[in-house]
Amino acid sequence: MSRSYNDELQYLDKIHKNCWRIKKGFVPNMLVEGVFYVNDPLEKLMFEELRNACRGGGFGGFLPAMKQIGNVAALPGIVHRSIGLPDVHSGYGFAIGNMAAFDMENPDAVVSPGGVGFDINCGVRLLRTNLDEGDVQPVKEQLAQSLFDHIPVGVGSKGVIPMGAKDLEEALEMGVDWSLREGYAWAEDKEHCEEYGRMLQADPNKVSSKAKKRGLPQLGTLGAGNHYAEIQVVDEIYNDYAAKKMGIDHKGQVCVMIHSGSRGLGHQVATDALVAMEKAMKRDRITVNDRQLACARITSEEGQDYLKGMAAAGNYAWVNRSSMTFLTRQAFSKVFSTTPDDLDMHVIYDVSHNIAKVEEHMVDGRQKTLLVHRKGSTRAFPPHHPLIPVDYQLTGQPVLIGGTMGTCSYVLTGTEQGMTETFGTTCHGAGRALSRAKSRRNLDFQDVLDKLADMGIAIRVASPKLVMEEAPESYKNVTDVVNTCHDAGISKKAIKLRPIAVIKG
């Protein structure tokens, strides 16, 4: 029997102005509470979605995000609480922007591919340059075209970096080390990647031949959807010290942001795992509230196979972003007739938005080894954390938050408070407010392109029809999302970037 909206509200408590609690009983079998972070405008969206669901209206066939956060709180082995970040929106199984951690010592604890997502290690990399907006404006169109020519974009796009089957096997195992060996990356790029660009538990044998077949031609390609390469300008510096450590010292400095993932390969790894896990659930009698939350015990063969395959797909995504960095450096050096080195095109940082990782965290005063699922959320470790690079030991880990086409992006830093409240996790971007289908119905792609042109943004798009799905109107306001995290203390604002050119699939 479904409850009325007013009945549902009995299970929701406001903890403080940026955080709500979802009490046990909101959905059946909750082992821990849920929480979600919002500010006033975002809160309205969340409750509106719940109200619509109570009336029988869904969002693209998914449950409302609040219900999804609750269902995750019912998964075996979850600790502390199921957490929704301010950009949370309905997704497959887990909401996108929902993170959860599972106790590795608990033999029943599970891993769920829906808690990582289909685009494994979809993530963002930020490069700096020593160019100014004044240097780029006169050649902006030329530069956008040069990037578009260098980086293969679009749904079925094929890579330009030569790769045979043996190369792919090695790339899946080695991640950025492969790019380094092949001359597509600089040694210091690796230092500035989450996991140093290589997940060591990766096993290419756990990636099906179908997945490899999909991945082989796509390496070094941008893909479609919300993936982009963007030329950006520093618009605001909130923390001078952190910005300087990142090599950003003034407004108007030019940066490049690359947002992409594991393409068809990661999608296939997730699909294969879901099939295997449905069987494992029957065998081990694991029950879940929503069949999209298919999962397997971490210690089971299916659980281990998925984690090894996921790590390989993660490595593929890091190689992919490295390849695109190589192509971006080439494009810039061609337009400015100088070397990428002379342009100071260093990687500030590279973060993952969709991944599950084994980490040490304090839970109820005890140190525990946890499998942390981050889907549409970003690791944000505090200063002095052993897993972040030397350069950022005093600032905290840089967190890259991509806006949507034509809106600002942000660089944040991790905090100690985030470590205790959210397992060192913060938001990842704007988060959808309209489903893709709805965006296509409501928006006209020419209007979207014209609006970008009016804002002085050069744009190159491989599939204009997909532009509406990515229009700023389809998303929550990224500034609301970032400010919520900042005010809640789970990450702090360092830099704001605005786009001057966008290359999209």
UniProtKB/Swiss-Prot annotation:
This is RNA-splicing ligase RtcB homolog. SUPFAM superfamilies: Hypothetical protein PH1602. It comes from Danio rerio. The gene is rtcb. It comes from the Eukaryota. Catalytic subunit of the tRNA-splicing ligase complex that acts by directly joining spliced tRNA halves to mature-sized tRNAs by incorporating the precursor-derived splice junction phosphate into the mature tRNA as a canonical 3',5'-phosphodiester. May act as an RNA ligase with broad substrate specificity, and may function toward other RNAs. GO terms for biological process: tRNA splicing, via endonucleolytic cleavage and ligation. It is found in: Nucleus; Cytoplasm. The active site is at H428. Its EC number is 6.5.1.8. Keywords: Cytoplasm, GTP-binding, Ligase, Manganese, Metal-binding, Nucleotide-binding, Nucleus, tRNA processing. PANTHER family: RNA-SPLICING LIGASE RTCB HOMOLOG. Its main location: nucleus. HAMAP family: RtcB_euk. InterPro entries: RtcB, RtcB-like_sf, RtcB_euk. Ligation probably proceeds through 3 nucleotidyl transfer steps, with 2',3'-cyclic phosphate termini being hydrolyzed to 3'-P termini in a step that precedes 3'-P activation with GMP. In the first nucleotidyl transfer step, RTCB reacts with GTP to form a covalent RTCB-histidine-GMP intermediate with release of PPi; in the second step, the GMP moiety is transferred to the RNA 3'-P; in the third step, the 5'-OH from the opposite RNA strand attacks the activated 3'-P to form a 3',5'-phosphodiester bond and release GMP. Catalytic component of the tRNA-splicing ligase complex.
